[in-house]
Amino acid sequence: MAESIKYIGASTHDLDLFEGQYSILNGMAYNSYVIDDEKIAIMDTVDKIVTDKWLENLEKALDGREPEYLVVQHLEPDHSGNINTLLKMYEHITLVCTAKAKAMLEQFDIEAENIMAVKEGDELSLGSHTLKFILAPMVHWPEVMMTYEESEKALFSADAFGKFGALDVDEDWSYEARRYYFNIVGKYGLPVSNVLKKAGKLDIKTIYPLHGPILSDEIPEVLRLYTIWSSYEPEDEGVFIAYASMHGNTAEAARKMKEILEEKSAKVAISDLSRSDIAKNVENAFRYSTLLCMAPSYDGTVFTPMADFIHRLKTKLYQNRRVALVENASWAPSAVKAMKSEFETMKNIDLIDNTVTIKTTLKENDIDALKSLADEILK
C-alpha cells in the first residue's frame, strides 16, 4: 500500500451467507480506506457487522484529525452501513457521490448536510493527492463509481475486482474471485467491459477493492481474467457435468460420462446439484466451454435442483456455450424437453442435437449412447 493510503476495513468469520445466499466458509472482508493529506478523505464505509473494528481502525488512522470527505462509491448496505455513524461523528463532513447515489440516499435513511455530486472525469484535490471520478453504472448497481488517484497510481474499484474471503485467508485470488464475479457482477458483462476500457487508459499500480485483498503484482492477470469473464466467453476448454439424481441412477450415469470424457483426454469438472453450492456450479458453468446437464424427469418437467440451476444461469445471462442434455425416466421422459426449452431462450447457446434418454438404470446400450454423445461434445 502507498504510505498515504491507510487500510481501515475489517474481516469477519461470523457470517455464514453473503447477501443472504452465498456461502462464505472463509469469511468476508469489508474494505475501507483513508487517504491522508491536507484534507482527509475516507473511501467508503463498511457493513454493520464489522463496525467496532472499523471504528477502531478509523480512530487510529485519523490520529485526532477530522476527515473532510467521505467518498461513497457504492450504496449497497455492506458499504454504506456506517455512513450515518460517520455523519454523527463528523457532522460537517462532505459526502462525495454520483448524482444517482445522491438521489438514493434517502431510501437508506441517510440525511447528509453536505453532498457533492460528481460526474465522469470530475476531480477533487486533497492537497498533494487529486481524486478523479470514473462512473461505473451497473457494476453492479446504477449509482456506482470508481476513483483514481494519479500520484499513487491507485484505483479504488468499488465492488469490481473483489472476492469472497477474509483477508487472513491465504489463497489464490482467482479461486474465490471467479465465484464472486459470476454470481455478484457477472450478469453485467457489458458495463464491466465499458469500465475496463476506462481502466485500460490509466496507469494503475495498485487496486483497492471493497472486498478481498489489495492488488498490485496480480493486476495484469486480474485484468486478463476480467476481460474474458465480462465477454461471456469460456475461460477453459472443457466440460462441466452438472447432474441431479433422485435414487442414484443418474449419478451413476454422470460418473460414467466423466470417465468416458476423461478417457478421450477432455478436461472435466462434475457436480451433484443437490449437494453442492449453487454459486460454485454457476461459476463452473461459465468457466467451461461445454455444459452437460443430466437429470431425471419430475412432475412432467425436470428434477427441481436442475430446474433451479438452469434458472440461475438464465438470470446471469448465460451464453456462448455448447450444451448437451441427458435425461432419466421410468415412464414419461420430460427432462430434455424442459431443459431444452430454457436453453433455447438464452443467447448463442449451441444445443447438441444428440440427446440421451436413460430408462431408470444404466445399461450397456445407454453407455454406448453416452459414448456417442461424448464424441459429439468433443467435436
Predicted regions mapped to residue ranges:
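Active-site metal-binding motif and surrounding structural segment of the metallo-beta-lactamase
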Residues: 38, 49-96
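FMN-binding flavodoxin-like domain, especially the glycine-rich phosphate-binding loop
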Residues: 167-207, 211-214, 256-271, 281-379
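Short, charged N-terminal beta->alpha structural module
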Residues: 242-264
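Active-site neighborhood of phospho(di)ester-bond hydrolases with catalytic His/Asp-centered motifs
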Residues: 43-45, 67-75, 95-98, 155-159, ...
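Short acidic active-site motifs
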Residues: 82, 276-281
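Metallo-beta-lactamase
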Residues: 1-3, 96-144, 188-194
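Conserved beta-strand hairpin/beta-sheet module of binuclear metal-dependent hydrolase folds
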Residues: 3-59, 146-149, 153-157, 250
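Short N-terminal or domain-adjacent regulatory/targeting segments
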Residues: 208-235
